[in-house]
Amino acid sequence: GVLVGAGTVRADDPRLTVRMAPAGRNPVRRMVLDARAQLPVDCALFDDIAEAPLHIFTRHDADEGDIERLESAGAHVHPVPHDAGGLDLQRVLDVAWEAGIESILCEGGARLAEALLREGRIQRLYLLIAPTTLGTGGVSAFPQDAKAVEWSAFSPACAPQVFGRDTLIVLDKEGD
């Protein structure tokens, strides 16, 4: 599966699908964390919902009308517990597992990455480093307090790979 937060959907309007998959053979299970069930049904995620399932995780006390709106558009909505820190990520992962999603690629932003790192939910990191300056509108890939992350738990899985001017570094969590 591919996991993003609602902020990424609003900012980028992604499809989260395999671009060159044969018709009817899109294997990606798309997952969005949307605490308030406010995703617009006219976003790109709903364009090919019949071919690529969309799972939306929301607070268990989200508005029933909003949940029904998303379900009527074809999404699978999963209310989960939450606290001040956001949705219960362990419950999100449990529901994903129950739905047959055994591996998840997080393409979300810094908030989601921070939560997953803080809770020790990441086994492998793919860091793609590009020589591009983002400027003032750029979004950080890591939490503001990256020092709080236990980086020593990760080690290189293979030699860095170079793609043009970009470099890919793959890190595995030790012991996993």
Where are the regions that the model predicts?
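Enzymes that bind and transform nitrogen-containing heteroaromatic metabolites
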Residues: 1-176
